[in-house]
């Protein structure tokens, strides 16, 4: 009998406090390879905090995280997780091409990467060498999204990825998500309704403080 693989990511009784006040939790969920999950909740319910916890930028106060069925160890899965938040992680004095090379180096994927192709795929052909500080807000978001094309991470953590994007940019994010999930990846996304996903009904994770 074939044994089903464990969830890619699982949370059990996950809780986070700030100054002894609960931000979210206890929270339980599972996310499998090939799944998209929408993180929903009112403002202040901890959606961004959850993604920062999963990215390893914050530590939970209680609960457990498991990665592929084993207790999550950051040193073992860091290269498999990429986080895109409100702060895009771009250096303003560097070009999109240079920023992508740095991102690839941090993920240990410099060799064989193609920043130019990634920038072309997100609509920034012709802006490869423009200092990021000179780009519009939407172009900066596209430059950050290009990391998703460049870094071979299994799990995408995307916090409001549609912000500052026009209709074409929103469609781009949806295409990136569909392609990633179809290839066996997984994604957790916070959004205010711009998701148009054609790869099946997304999972929904409801946040409560």
Describe the function of each predicted region.
Residues 55:
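Helix-to-loop junction immediately C-terminal to a conserved catalytic motif
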Residues 87, 92-108, 114:
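Q-loop/switch helix immediately C-terminal to the Walker
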Residues 156-160:
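Catalytic Walker B motif of ABC-type/P-loop ATPase nucleotide-binding domains
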Residues 93, 131-138:
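Conserved ABC ATPase signature
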Residues 101, 112-127:
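Conserved ABC ATPase "signature" region
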Residues 145, 184:
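Hydrophobic anchor residue at the start of the ABC signature
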Residues 63-79:
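Conserved ABC transporter NBD signature motif
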Residues 148-149:
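ABC ATPase C-loop
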């Amino acid at each position: 009998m074939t044994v089903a693989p464990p969830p890619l990511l699982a949370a059990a009784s996950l809780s986070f406090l700030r100054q002894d006040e609960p931000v979210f939790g206890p929270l339980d969920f599972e996310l499998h390879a090939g799944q998209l999950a929408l993180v929903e909740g009112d403002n202040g319910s901890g959606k961004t905090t959850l993604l920062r916890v999963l990215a390893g930028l914050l530590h939970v106060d209680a609960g457990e995280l498991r990665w592929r069925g084993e207790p999550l160890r950051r040193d073992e899965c860091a290269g498999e997780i990429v986080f895109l938040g409100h702060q895009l992680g771009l250096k303003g004095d560097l070009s999109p091409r240079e920023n992508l090379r740095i991102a690839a180096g941090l993920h240990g994927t410099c060799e064989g990467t193609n920043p130019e192709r990634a920038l072309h795929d997100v609509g920034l052909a012709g802006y490869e060498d423009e200092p990021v500080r000179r780009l519009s807000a939407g172009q900066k978001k596209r430059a950050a999204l290009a990391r998703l094309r460049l870094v071979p991470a299994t799990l995408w953590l995307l916090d409001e990825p549609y912000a500052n994007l026009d209709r074409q940019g929103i469609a781009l994010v949806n295409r990136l998500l569909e392609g990633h999930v179809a290839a066996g990846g997984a994604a957790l996304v916070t959004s205010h309704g711009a998701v148009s996903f054609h790869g099946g009904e997304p999972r929904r994770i409801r946040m409560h403080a």
